[in-house]
Regions:
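Structured alpha-helical segments in the cores of large, soluble enzyme domains
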Residues: 74-86
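Cofactor- and metal-binding active-site motifs of prokaryotic enzymes
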Residues: 1-74, 111-113, 127-144, 158, ...
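A residue-level signal for conserved active-site and pocket-lining positions in enzyme catalytic cores
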Residues: 25, 88, 145, 182, ...
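An anion-binding catalytic pocket shared by soluble metabolic enzymes
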Residues: 19-20, 97, 103-179, 267-293
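A glycine-rich phosphate-binding loop feature that marks nucleotide/adenosyl-phosphate handling sites
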Residues: 131-134, 200-208, 264-266
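Conserved hydrophobic core element of enzyme catalytic domains
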Residues: 218-323
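Contiguous alpha-helical scaffold segments within structured protein domains
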Residues: 44-72, 78, 102-103, 155-250, ...
Length: 323
């Protein structure tokens, strides 16, 4: 099953798994796993979601053997990452961890958790799925791409840099977001004569904010999937050079990213949209793993980076319904 809600919409959707169409698919970070949801996109009411009442008790898998990375270990590792960034002259490298949430005997109401996330993040793409013994929920507003089938306009954004809502930007975040903008600009310029780029502005997300630029470009329909495969993973979730940074992530992160920092493709009559899968968590019968990361630069402070991941984890954590 899959429930989802588009950004700025009040309607909830599900996909009935009956037909040959594949309107929604989840792509893992490493692109090796694609989870398809086939059928028609149908609408579903809040009451129907509530009455289905899906609890963590009903999930088939328990959390496999897992050792959570502690603050001191994570910070030690980030010191090594910073050295690596300096040695290789990288502008940034995105490193992530998994925060463990044990239910301690009180099951989670996953349906209510989904609705809480929808309420808390009106500008986000919010989803909840259970399939092939996997269960994930997420809510985030970063667009990897949006293609308008009628006008052939392609939209995307560069989103990076994080600070608490009431703090002021420093050169660290500004320098962290720039490579994302440059990376996207270079790709779009190869596919379009006309690429529009907005000013940089603040993108609010609960207790934190990010730096953001929006792009618009006229493209041809046949290029959409090619552009997406060049864009993913952007330096907002990986780094540049892409393949070098992907390998470095594999070396520094002790657990796989799975669907975290991958993307979700959703197609309807008007658009094909691709949402970056951040602020997400994997749920098991007895515990959940919240996936969080951040862009590390030569200027990073390991302690601040740890705090940033804690703040990002809050985005999901505070909306979990312990029934
Ligand atoms: C990698 C994550 O966030 C990305 C998106 C916005 C800001 C980011 C940052 O400030 O590091 C990251 O690039 C995450 O939330 O796990």
């Amino acid at each position: 099953m899959l429930y989802f809600r588009f950004p700025f919409s009040e309607d909830y959707n599900f996909v009935d798994e009956n037909l040959d169409k594949n309107p929604v698919s989840f792509h893992s970070f490493d692109n090796l796993e694609i989870l398809d949801f086939s059928g028609e996109i149908e609408s579903i009411s809040k009451d129907e979601i509530l009455s289905a009442e899906i609890l963590s008790d009903s999930l088939s898998s328990k959390l496999p053997l897992f050792e959570e990375e502690q603050q001191s270990d994570y910070q030690q590792k980030l010191l090594k990452v910073i050295d690596f960034i300096k040695e290789n002259d990288l502008s940034k490298l995105v490193i992530s961890r998994r925060k463990l949430v044990k239910y301690e005997g009180s099951p989670i109401n996953l349906s209510r958790t989904f609705l809480n996330l929808c309420k808390a993040y009106p500008n986000a793409f919010v989803y909840f799925f259970i399939k092939d013994e996997k269960c994930w929920l997420g809510a985030f507003s970063e667009l990897l791409g949006k293609f308008n089938k009628k006008t052939s306009e392609f939209e995307t954004m560069s989103l990076a840099g994080t600070i608490p809502v009431h703090e002021s930007w420093t050169s660290k975040e500004i320098e962290e977001q720039k490579p994302v903008t440059d990376f996207i600009k270079n790709i779009l310029n190869a596919y379009s004569e006309k690429v529009e780029l907005s000013e940089t502005y603040d993108h609010l997300s609960g207790n934190i904010k990010h730096l953001r630029n929006d792009f618009k470009a006229q493209i041809v329909r046949e290029d959409v999937e090619k552009i997406i495969s060049e864009l993913h993973p952007t330096p907002a979730v990986c780094g540049i050079p892409k393949d070098f940074c992907r390998k470095a992530i594999g070396k520094f992160e002790k657990d796989p990213r799975n669907f975290y920092a991958g993307y979700i493709r959703v197609e309807n009559d008007d658009f094909v949209q691709y949402f970056v899968n951040l602020r997400c968590a994997e749920f098991f019968q007895d515990a959940a793993l919240i996936y969080v990361g951040g862009g590390i630069t030569a200027e990073s402070s390991p302690e601040k980076e740890w705090r940033e991941t804690e703040l990002k984890a809050e985005a999901v954590l505070k909306n979990i319904d312990f029934s």
